[in-house]
Amino acid sequence: MKYSLNFYLILSLMLFVACEEGNVELYNAGDDFIYVTVDELRHDMAPHSMKLLELKKGRHKIVITDREGKTLEEDTFEVNKGGLLNVSKHSYIVWTDLYWASSEENSKLRETKLQEEALEIDGQEYVGEFQELDEEQLFIESEWDYGLGEEFPASLWGLEFAQEKWSIKRKIFRKKELAEAYMKLVKR
């Protein structure tokens, strides 16, 4: 019985992970309504709206038009493991953070596992490992664990049982939302 339960748990986890591959976040960070056509399927995107697209690995065609039908951009992009369609050429930052099971190991681990530097946003300085993404890039391949619509968790369950008592996770943020999340997470 124990083995069959473990088998189903592992199978469920594998299916969940497999379903996650190819997820592409389509986000209109702009103030104007746009139409985004991906592989001949049109998505009506209100300002500051987001949709999750299930795209297979491979090359895809995109056409972005305004309300009047004027083509703003036409291009192709390659999906390998998912990512973000940056249709409004917005600024994004990936924050890499360390989770640990024991608080006394925190500072030593941070020094050895992260490359922390200061980042300034609107005159405020934030210290951490940040990667500013190229805002001119139409498709940004996922190098993060948590997307725009997901929370950066305050803690990870099960680290005390893991062989390594720490884990590194990454989340993509809109530049303006990083400050708010930073203040919440550094207090943990």
Model-identified regions with their sequence ranges:
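Sec-dependent bacterial lipoprotein signal peptides
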Residues: 1-17
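Short loop/turn and low-complexity linker motifs enriched in small/turn-promoting residues
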Residues: 19-56, 65-188
